[in-house]
Amino acid sequence: MDKAKQIYLEFKREADFLELDFPLFLGDGPGFGELCMDYSEQDGYMLYGYERGKRNSEFKTTDFEEFKYEVFLHICWYMGMEFELRHWKEDMRHDDNILETDTRKIAFEKTLQLLKMVNPAWIDKAAQGYTAYLNLWRENKNVYFDKEAMEFKVNS
């Protein structure tokens, strides 16, 4: 078995064990924007979107742990976004300055909860990026991640 397939099956087993969706293809997918992975001696580990015969947003590394983090971050993020869509309220007034109306908060919290199941050590790194994103359009850059409660909050 080649190395790419071995890694793919290892990730799939772990995702199945943790009851995570596994929207990852080995090599190029059908071409409708799928999340794909591959490995080569020259480029190392690769994670990318595959759409219309082209690799997009390709992430490459030779560090296996960094690659595993990125794979599971993407898998958990997909599930977090799906969770957000199920909890979207059409009648809610959306305002980037009111954290409770920012549905990205819900998606990111769910993503971090799922990621914690895979590897709790990854929470801080992922939470930093999501906190920066939630603060991006806010007038007061006061969102922080409460690791104990596993939710984003606002400093008063």
Where are these regions (language model features)?
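Residues that form generic nucleotide/phosphate-binding pockets
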Residues: 10, 14, 70, 114
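Intrinsically disordered, low-complexity, charge-dense segments enriched in Lys/Arg
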Residues: 80-156
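A generic structural signal for ordered alpha-helices
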Residues: 15, 45-49, 89, 93
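N-terminal "first-domain core" detector
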Residues: 1-41
